[in-house]
């Protein structure tokens, strides 16, 4: 069983919760904490969480997931001391449970540990210790390789470490449409990499934005590449082998959502792991020297992307 090795925060005593106190309400507490985090209601979230807390020898995964949402909410509000406190509780409680059960044996434990590590890393960076943050996430990436949180950890590692570094070469197992440009063909170009999924509505909304950018800036040297991967299913969640999914992408999917002729689409699972794509779309902007200038999980508007691209074209 993988154990996290580098975490050492002696100032915080672990606060634990009774499983009996959470019977029938844990899942609803997780949902409530999530809603409050996104709403920016940090003080209310803390009051709700602490009102449910009682002493026990062992936390439940559900409780720790709720704690991790408290940490995320505090980080959204940039209340870093509070974020560190609850992220540490989520991590240390998760590590205690990992002595007795695998990480992916149920759905709440990966949420608790993954979010705890994410928040703690960004807290360290916000407090001015980026090296500590990168080391934390690098060790976690190694320790939890092959688990459901691997890509999430990689995403947050790259958020803190990829910008300003050379863009790694993509793998191409298969491709859609025209052959993707080779590394040599991309030299001297400004390249926007658009990591997407066929099931992703945000990706479909992003495509017209990319089309507009291509039309505006292609003659100045902008290239757009759209990596994707096999997901194991086709329309409506129907299970599919890679061969069946590729046929679907080239057939029924392309008939409804044509693959743009201006965007090469390499297909490889390793690209999504290597670039930490747990959010689709993920956008990576690379300058003419092959250096990453922006790593952005999530979509961006035409105006936001144009403001990033135009200085690189000068």
Please tell me what each predicted stretch does:
Residues 174, 223-225, 240-280, 286:
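Short, internal strand/loop/helix patches
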Residues 189-190, 205-229:
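Conserved helix-turn-beta segment immediately C-terminal to the redox Cys motif
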Residues 53-62, 93-110:
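Flexible helix-coil transition and linker loops at the boundaries of alpha-helical arrays
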Residues 130-173, 184-187, 251:
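N-proximal helix/coil linker or "cap" segments that precede and/or mark the start of modular domains
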Residues 280, 284-314:
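Thiol-/selenol-based redox modules, centered on thioredoxin-like
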Residues 195-212, 233:
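Conserved redox-active cysteine motifs that mediate thiol-disulfide chemistry
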């Amino acid at each position: 069983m993988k154990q996290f090795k580098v975490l050492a925060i002696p100032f915080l005593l672990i606060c634990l919760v009774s499983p009996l106190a959470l019977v029938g309400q844990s899942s609803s507490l997780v949902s409530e904490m999530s809603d409050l985090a996104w709403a920016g209601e940090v003080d209310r979230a803390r009051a709700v969480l602490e009102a449910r807390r009682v002493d026990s020898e062992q936390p439940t995964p559900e409780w720790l997931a709720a704690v991790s949402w408290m940490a995320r909410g505090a980080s959204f509000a940039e209340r870093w001391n509070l974020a560190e406190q609850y992220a540490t509780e989520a991590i240390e409680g998760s590590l205690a449970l990992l002595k007795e059960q695998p990480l992916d044996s149920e759905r709440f434990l990966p949420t608790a540990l993954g979010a705890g590590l994410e928040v703690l890393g960004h807290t360290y960076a916000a407090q001015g210790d980026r090296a500590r943050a990168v080391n934390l996430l690098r060790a976690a990436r190694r320790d939890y390789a092959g688990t459901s949180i691997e890509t999430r950890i990689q995403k947050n590692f790259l958020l803190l470490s990829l910008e300003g570094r050379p863009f790694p070469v993509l793998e191409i197992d298969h491709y859609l449409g025209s052959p993707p440009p080779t590394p040599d063909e991309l030299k001297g170009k400004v390249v926007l990499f658009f990591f997407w999924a066929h099931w992703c509505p945000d990706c479909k909304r992003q495509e017209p934005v990319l089309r507009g950018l291509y039309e505006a800036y292609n003659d100045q040297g902008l290239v757009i590449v759209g990596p994707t991967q096999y997901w194991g299913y086709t329309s409506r969640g129907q299970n599919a082998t890679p061969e069946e999914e590729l046929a679907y992408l080239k057939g029924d999917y392309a008939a409804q959502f044509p693959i743009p002729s201006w965007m090469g689409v390499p297909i490889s699972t390793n690209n999504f792991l290597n670039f930490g794509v747990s959010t689709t779309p993920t956008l990576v902007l690379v300058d003419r020297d092959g250096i990453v200038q922006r790593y952005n999980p999530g979509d961006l508007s035409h105006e936001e992307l144009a403001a990033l691209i135009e200085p690189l074209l000068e």
